[in-house]
Amino acid sequence: MALMDIGFFSESLGMAVHCMALVPHARDGEVLPRRQTLYLLHGYGDSYTSWIRKTNLERYAAHHNLAVIMPDAQKSAYTDMSHGGKFFTYIADELPAKMRAFLPLSERREDTFIAGFSMGGYGALKIGLARPTQYAAIGCISAGVSNDTPDTAALRELRTGGRLLKDTEEDVPASIARAAALGEAAPRIYHTIGQEDFLLSSARETRDLLCSYPGDPFHYIYEEKPGKHGWEFCDGALRDFLQWLSPAPR
């Protein structure tokens, strides 16, 4: 696996940014197709380096021959902020186009996935469901549609400035309804959380919402397992998500 720290200018954010990339490399003389790609989002208080530093991601990705892109979203909740950057637009639209220009990544929907932990799990649901024709599968680890807690509530004003997200492309319940209407073309969703996680009630509310659509359009998997909100649980959840996503190495 090649590990890269990629710096470039983001037009959406109006500033220089960095992301981490893991890309499988070819053996001598081997010609490989453009790579299946996972966009992997960090949680509140973490950064674009956290997945590499705190999990066994590289080993898991190598086993599945999967490229992984890890952007930085600060504490944005993957939102186009009223008093800050347009992180939703950056990660939903600009980042995939830039990465495919820089790296040998597949442009096919069936080869493109998004997942995240905590705030990143919320972001993966938000972006994956708002762009259902772009992602074949979504992984939500230790999160739900609403992740508000007392320590993050003060950021709501910076993120939205009182702006209502209802009926916008950042309205996750509305995106769920639109994606569900696609039927078999909707993204698959894998959702897991620890039984001692402080966001468990949010995850269960999200489970109930996703399960309310007839016909299981998301081929939805929901799992509660022993564990708290942290990297020890997240590492195992990442391994399980990738096994669900791609049972056999490519």
Region locations from a protein language model:
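Non-catalytic cap/lid and distal C-terminal segments of serine-dependent acyl enzymes
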Residues: M1-R250
